Amino acid sequence: LIFPATLNSLFQTADDYYRNERIVTFLRLIRYVAAFLALALPGLYVAAATFHPQLLPGNLIRSMAEARSGVPFPTAAEVLLMELSFELLREAGLRMPGPAGNTIGIVGGLIVGQAAVSANLVSPITVTVAALTALGSFSIPNEELSEVFRLWKYGILLLGSCFGILGVMLGCFLLLMLMAEQESYGIPWLYPYVGGNLNERADEKDSMFLAAARKRKRRPIFAKWGNRIRFRRKS
């Protein structure tokens, strides 16, 4: 079967519809937050540490300065080094057979991060940022979407290291504009956040927030036009 693919559908999983709608709503919010971390956290960290330290609490600035003492690389190079290391570990884990492949990504990341900190190549907070970014990308349900966010992460990191917070915002807006232009079989890729009235706004009840089953009386827009009513009253 071939259906339109939308951003909203790529954040949904099959087991969402076997759980309580409040739990599903919470988990979907976590996925969206994780996607944002996977996309923008490295750029935000570099921008805040390099251009806008006044945005951070004083105690955090002092901790970051103490942690970075002795590190020979600038902040952007630190983050790029750790991100590429995690990408290498991820790729190695995919190529290794059996349970060892699942283990190398987590254990290898901890070992490499600790070794880099001990050698004063990176600071501990940079390892933390890279680990949170990796966890965010793992939390995206769709692997292809996760790869897109991982690729755009480097563009936003470059913009953040050159232009600060403004560069991060510019990168996010460019990605949003590209997504808004896309369509899948005539359906906007940002549906139902864009063009939600195509199905009488029924799909908004199954988006970032999942409404109760009794309120979702219409099937998604992907269903056949004459078969979009889930519940019909007996005549």
Model feature map: region roles:
Residues 126, 130-235:
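Hydrophobic alpha-helical transmembrane segments of membrane transport and translocation systems
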Residues 34-53, 68-144, 148-149, 154-160, ...:
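Transmembrane alpha-helix detector for multi-pass membrane proteins
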Residues 1-78, 145, 184-212, 225-234:
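Cytosolic regulatory modules rich in charged/polar residues
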